[in-house]
Amino acid sequence: MNDTSELIMVAMSGGVDSSVAAMLLLEQGYDVAGVSLQLKSNNEPYGNGYNLKLINRAREVAAALGIPHYVVDLSDIFSQRVIADFCQQYSQGRTPNPCIRCNYYVKIGALLEKIPDFNAGYLATGHYARVLSDENGTHLLKGADEKKDQSYFLYTLPPESLSRLIFPLGKRYKKDIIRLADKMKLPVSQKESQDVCFIPDGDYKSFLATRMGFTPGKILDKTGKILGEHQGLPLYTIGQRQGLGLASNEKLFVSDMNPEANTIMVASHDQLYTSRILLSNFIWRESRIPLDTPGMIVKVRYKAAPAEVKKISQTGDFYLLELASPVWAATPGQAAVIYLGDMVLGGGIIEHGGDVA
């Protein structure tokens, strides 16, 4: 984008990344305004005070930068699209990634629909990712800082959204962003963002307990032998070892959950490795790149080490991902995001890891 006369709305959380993103755009001569999201209704018991604290901090940063600051209430769509799905997924023994849905539906999706109300043409965020536009279209790329790259959380964004997005931090490194914030004495928090912003204390159990009941059930081994009792599927995730309450000479981990039977299966560490993963809601962003292109890698969790993709094939409404080497604890509900070099090719939601019929 070269037209500095068109207003850019910067999604501001009060954190260092979005604050420096706004500052960098100002330094480049752009017309900038800040916008923060009201994501909690007044009757929401969890996280409302935390959300208001962030909004107030963003307002302070905007004042320090000398730019207008606005608040947009997206609490309804956030509740419907993010929190409700989060709870539903956990009730089924899955482990969702709410940030991906939030970016698609709320923080980017819904906010892009709002910015014309402010006569703005673009939305900027503090994500560590890049957008490349060329004769083949608009592409999503990793951020330059591999340790902070957030393209994983953005893989569902359509090209028409990417074409209106600006990522000022895409070519920068976190250490430099912190240095810039200190140099400009911006009133921001240096703490990393919460994994799940609507559970700022990290107490998933208490959060879920306000929205659903927990039904105890059996813990089984691979042979079907009953080893113990679990306290409710939402309290567990694939790969979990702590909190099982099992007396065993072998280290056992949650390997599978059956919501219909309300059972949890456990297995040894090595038995959680798989080189076959079934994906739903599959997205392929780059139609010009075949599914059998060599050199593709996949991340099955945000912090997971990448694994080489051997083959992608369609099976009914799903896609089967076959890997050159196994990954550990492929978790239903998490996203598997596929890359070729720095480019995000697509991905889907993990339904099952292991032998797929």
From Swiss-Prot:
GO terms for cellular component: cytoplasm. Its EC number is 2.8.1.13. Residues 148-150, 301-302 are annotated as: Interaction with tRNA. Its main location: cytoplasm. One of its GO terms (biological process) is tRNA wobble position uridine thiolation. ATP binds at residues 11-18, 37, 126. It is an enzyme of class 2 (transferase). Disulfide bonds join 102-197. The keyword Cytoplasm applies. Coiled coil: none annotated. One of its GO terms (molecular function) is tRNA-uridine 2-sulfurtransferase activity. It is found in: Cytoplasm. It comes from the Bacteria. The active site is at residues 102, 197. The record marks 127, 334 as: Interaction with tRNA. It holds the Pfam family tRNA_Me_trans_M. Signal peptide: none annotated. Keywords: ATP-binding, Cytoplasm, Disulfide bond, Nucleotide-binding, RNA-binding, Transferase, tRNA processing, tRNA-binding. It catalyses: S-sulfanyl-L-cysteinyl-[protein] + uridine(34) in tRNA + AH2 + ATP = 2-thiouridine(34) in tRNA + L-cysteinyl-[protein] + A + AMP + diphosphate + H(+). Catalyzes the 2-thiolation of uridine at the wobble position (U34) of tRNA, leading to the formation of s(2)U34. Belongs to the MnmA/TRMU family. This is tRNA-specific 2-thiouridylase MnmA.
